[in-house]
């Protein structure tokens, strides 16, 4: 029987690692190749170092803009589809961060994730972040 919860658990792990700043753990839960689509330029990151490259670019942009303390909270999944060794998860999300010390909340974001089951573990193969409103 296919488990609908295992891919969602992997998505939550990835976000938990992001929230604690554990980039190596974020990368370890990803498939190779990995793809990221985000609102931050250059908007697309691909390959075995996609997560590390994306995180570095987020931190550089944050430093330039005075943004710190990023934290993502995921809601209940809107969509979970598991077919064999592939899964697709769509989750509403809220991101909080500080800009020059002022708290900002970005609500209504959508985190869409494609996963592959490799060696009995769900790995994130791609994700896209659709920005909400601040």
Model-derived regions, located:
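A solvent-exposed, acidic/Ser-Thr-rich amphipathic alpha-helical stretch
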Residues: 23-85
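Beta-strand residues in well-ordered beta-sheet regions across diverse protein folds
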Residues: 37, 90-92, 125
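Short, low-complexity N-terminal intrinsically disordered segments enriched in polar/charged residues
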Residues: 1-33, 123
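Hydrophobic/aromatic beta-strand elements that line small-molecule binding cavities or substrate pockets
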Residues: 74-80, 93-95, 110-116, 129
């Amino acid at each position: 029987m296919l488990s609908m919860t295992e891919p969602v658990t992997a998505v939550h792990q990835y976000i938990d690692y992001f929230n604690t700043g554990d980039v190596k753990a974020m990368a370890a839960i990803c498939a190779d190749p990995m793809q990221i689509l985000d609102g931050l330029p250059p908007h697309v990151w691909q390959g075995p170092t996609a997560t590390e490259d994306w995180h570095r670019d987020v931190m550089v942009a944050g430093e330039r803009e005075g943004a710190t303390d990023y934290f993502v909270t995921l809601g209940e999944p809107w969509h979970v589809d598991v077919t064999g060794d592939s899964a697709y998860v769509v989750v509403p999300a809220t991101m909080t961060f500080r800009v020059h010390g002022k708290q900002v909340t970005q609500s209504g974001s959508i985190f869409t994730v494609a996963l592959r089951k490799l060696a009995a573990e769900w790995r994130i193969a791609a994700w896209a972040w659709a920005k909400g409103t601040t």
